Swiss-Prot record:
GO process annotations (BP): co-translational protein modification; translation
Active site: 137
Record keyword Protein transport present: no
Protein name as annotated: Peptide deformylase
Superkingdom as given in the UniProt entry: Bacteria
Keywords for the protein's UniProt record, in alphabetical order: Hydrolase, Iron, Metal-binding, Protein biosynthesis
Upper lineage: Bacteria, Pseudomonadati, Thermodesulfobacteriota, Desulfobulbia, Desulfobulbales
Metal-binding in keyword set: yes
Top-level class of the enzyme under EC nomenclature: hydrolase
GO molecular function, one term: peptide deformylase activity
Enzyme Commission number, as recorded: 3.5.1.88
Organism: Desulfotalea psychrophila (strain LSv54 / DSM 12343)
Catalytic activities: N-terminal N-formyl-L-methionyl-[peptide] + H2O = N-terminal L-methionyl-[peptide] + formate
Cofactor(s) the record lists: Fe(2+)
InterPro entries listed in its UniProt record: Peptide_deformylase (IPR023635), Peptide_deformylase_sf (IPR036821)
Length: 169
């Protein structure tokens, strides 16, 4: 397994359209293992393929119950939210949007159709924090960053901060 480079805002790969996974092979297994290792190393609780420069409809999410527990994760290929209920506001951060935490409004309960690592169709209904994580990661597959859910004022403040990081000293 390998730790991959995480792409950060404003890298254009984060906005690219992703393509569906159609081949479920050892290469995909290796990619998801590397993604999981990268996610836990960061540390994070979810990672989408665009965040490591791959324009694929693929996410890995931690299923560990506590931070100190075994590194368990699930793979979701071609995930799609098919049902959503209620809303909630929760604090989010993103490995691709460093140094920013913000309150974001998301659905409280969602149903997601996806394929597992073997290409088998699956469906899952989740709520609360896990629903937030899945919505966040699925947004990445559509070129949407959690930054896009913020007010224009907060977005612009963050953009100014990022520009300063790249100015010559």
């Amino acid at each position: 397994m390998a730790i991959l480079k995480i792409c950060t805002y404003p890298d254009p790969v984060l906005r690219k359209e992703t393509v569906a996974i159609t081949v479920f092979d050892e290469k995909l297994v290796k990619l998801t293992e590397d993604m999981a290792e990268t996610m836990y190393d960061a540390p994070g609780i979810g990672l989408a393929a665009p965040q490591i420069g791959e324009s694929l409809k693929l996410v890995v999410v931690s299923t560990a119950r506590r931070e100190d527990s075994k590194q368990e994760y699930m793979v979701m290929a071609n995930p799609e939210i098919v049902e959503k209920e209620e809303s909630q506001v929760d604090e989010e951060g993103c490995l691709s949007v460093p140094e920013l935490l913000a309150m974001v409004k998301r659905y409280r309960k969602i149903k997601v159709n996806y394929q597992d690592i073997n290409g088998e169709p699956c469906s899952m209904t989740v709520e609360d924090r896990f629903a937030v994580v899945l919505q966040h990661e699925i947004d990445h597959l559509n070129g949407i960053l959690f930054l896009d859910h913020l007010s224009s004022l907060k977005r612009n403040l963050y953009k100014k901060k990022v520009k300063k990081w790249f100015l010559p000293r």
